[in-house]
Structure formats: structure tokens, C-alpha cells
């Protein structure tokens, strides 16, 4: 999301909350296993790994797209533009469909997963930020502390999870990934990923990726080019993270 005018204000309001939460919630360590190239023109809004490839949704008005990417080289193998004036957001795959949210238009798009050819559209209330899935449901963030649970066939909401950290609602939940029975969520305008217990909605640990943030002078727009993007290769237990217009994707290994 571009949100430049008020991003610094939100960050100022959010940091005290996270600092309070950090007093009682552990921060989990990690090591960087490997880095991969990432398109510095890609304003990453959604990311997932499937069958050896990354799938990415990029934002910005008139520049939004969905794409299939070769992990090792960063090469874009397939790409479909999101129609203007829609601002592309989170994506997820369900069987032969690629499902994409848009930011404020209350409209989503469904593509053929194999060809990225547009199939149909769907609607929802509020904003669309991110999508992920488990074996039976989709999960959607909308910038609030609530993660919606969607029926993957109808794309209608069937439940929700209120996310709390240290007893307080945790707003600005952004990119999501389902990892080993937990929800991982980027917290917009921070360098933290929240590990969330989906049964209780409680944040059980933070992953602070501050050390991975590129130097400001290497980013085209440091206030907006923030941490966002989580993908998981379940078969090989590989976790990938990146940010908007970052030059690298990081494969990280979480500590015990």
C-alpha cells in the first residue's frame, strides 16, 4: 500500500504498542541460509511458493500484476497485469485457481493458475491486504486485527480470528503465510513478523528482521519499501522473506 502521507504517523503510534508486547512475547532468532535475487520494481503485496516456483502479486496503481517467478534467478516466467485502476494485493492458490485481492476496490480476481489467464471476479467488504491457506480454508487480512476465514469455493467469509499481542489487538496485519499450523503475518510499518496461534489468535512469538532491511539509500522509497512477503516451501521446510522493491529474497531458518 502506498500510504506515504500517514505511514510515519502510524509507525509512531504502533511502535509503543509493539514495545509493550515485546515485554511478554519472546523474539525468536533466525539465521540466513541463502539469498536470491528479487525484482526491485516489484512492490510485493503477496507471495507464496508452489511446486518449485514463487508466485508474487505486486501493487501500485497501473503497475499491479500477478507473476510466476524462478526462485534461483528472479526471472519472471509468466505475468498478468491487474486491470487499472485496481491496486493488487495478496494472492493464494486453490487447486487450479490463483486468487488475488485488491486494496480498496472491494474486488478480487481469479486467474487460471497454469496460464494466469483471468477467469472471474468476486467481491468482499472492506480492504483487501493478504491471503494464505491451510488444507480447508483461506485466510484474509484487511489491515485490522482481524483475520477472516473464507470458504475457498465461494470466497465468502465463514469466520474470523481476532489477533492479540500481550492482550491488546494487533492492527496492521499484512502479508500472511500458513506455516506448520500457525499463521505468520507481517506487521505493516515494522520489521516484525508475528507468529500467531490460529486457535486463540494470540501472538506467540515475534521474528524481528530488522537486520535484513536494505540501507535506505539503496531503496527507491524507503518509507514505503518495507518488509512484506512470506513464502514457505513445506516439502523442504524452507521459509522465504522479502520486502517491497527489495533487491533480495532471504531464505531463513528459525531458531528453536
Where in this protein do the model-derived segments appear?
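Hydrophobic, well-structured mid-protein blocks that either form specific transmembrane helices
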Residues: 108-166
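Conserved beta-strand positions in repeat-built beta-propeller and related beta-rich domains
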Residues: 56-60, 98-105, 140-144, 185-189, ...
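Short loop/turn segments that connect beta-strands within beta-propeller blades
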Residues: 70-74, 112-116, 152-155, 197-201, ...
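A short beta-strand motif characteristic of beta-propeller blades
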Residues: 32-37, 75-81, 117-122, 159-168, ...
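A short helix->beta-strand "capping" segment at the edge of beta-propeller domains
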Residues: 23-40, 71-75
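Beta-strand-rich domains and repeat architectures in extracellular enzymes and scaffolds
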Residues: 33-65, 80-92, 243-245
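Blade-loop segments of beta-propeller domains
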Residues: 74-110, 117-128
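Beta-rich, blade/repeat-based domains predominating
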Residues: 40-51, 84-95, 124-136, 141, ...
